[in-house]
Amino acid sequence: LVNWSKPVVVLKEPFHLSYPWVFEENEKVYMIPETGQDGSIRLYEATSDSLSSFRLVKKLLEQPKDKEIKMGYGDSSIYKKDGKYYLMTMLQYSEPVNVLELYISDKFEGPYTPHPSSPIIESNKVGRDAGCWLEHQGKLLRVSQDCTHRYGDNVHVSEITKLSPTEYEETILKEKILPTDIPFYKEGGHQFNVINFKGKWIVATDAKEYHRLIGTRIIHKIKSKL
């Protein structure tokens, strides 16, 4: 983790890409980025050992065409337990409220069907994931981004207490884990990922930054032309 290679474009599509969740399954490396603008959840496979290029394998889910969609699939991840694959994702229907949905499949590549407990949550506070599910000290954790007042205000942690083909339950474990008293996190953040690497825990987060001066200059220019 000391030396880093030069950044390269590993995937290019004619729609918005973000939240590049990269993982390994059956000795192959895959990626599920956010592709909600396309109206689908897409699975890509790495085509090089350097992970510098990916190819589309298939669409795991496509948005329902009989419902009004305000915001497409966002921040999707898969978790495997007891031979079942659980896919968690977020949608916004006719109202600006995050709806957390859960799907299940016997196979990694699907088909995925709605879990009996889905939708899990309809909430702007904890209804959108902030990273993949985490296993820590015997607990299964889900991190969520708080969008109550604005996009990515902070991150909460919930413990998933029940997960089976027929049940899902969770409870909030800790709220606002990003320390906003530290200048770096002053404006909040919306992502939290953890990995155990060579016996040590490595945490990746982000932080929001507002360029108020730039916004002020733009407003000034607009007013000066009126």
Region spans (language model):
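Carbohydrate-active catalytic/glycan-binding domains of CAZyme proteins
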Residues: 1-226
